[in-house]
């Protein structure tokens, strides 16, 4: 399938889904390189500057969702990771796959700090896991 067609199809399916996917990708980059939350913020700033063509395709709600999510994750990064660590029984955080860690970070942030309904989070995270996991 043509990559441009795939992107258009995602935008048509729902703006926040595409925005959530972008948040996931940024968090994944940080988790894959074992970077800090400050580096997540730096990567986000670089993303905004260097991917102007893609950013221009986002609507105001999508861009605001991405910005608020990244800022919220950066602000609460260590708390989010602590919550995940406390709730993973018999499994070390470091042993969780990078994709799965990034998905857990996004899901935990949305559930605890954005009060997104758990049904929405579960559906969206499962869809991202199918695509990237």
At which residue positions do the language-model features occur?
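N-terminal interaction/assembly modules
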Residues: 1-132
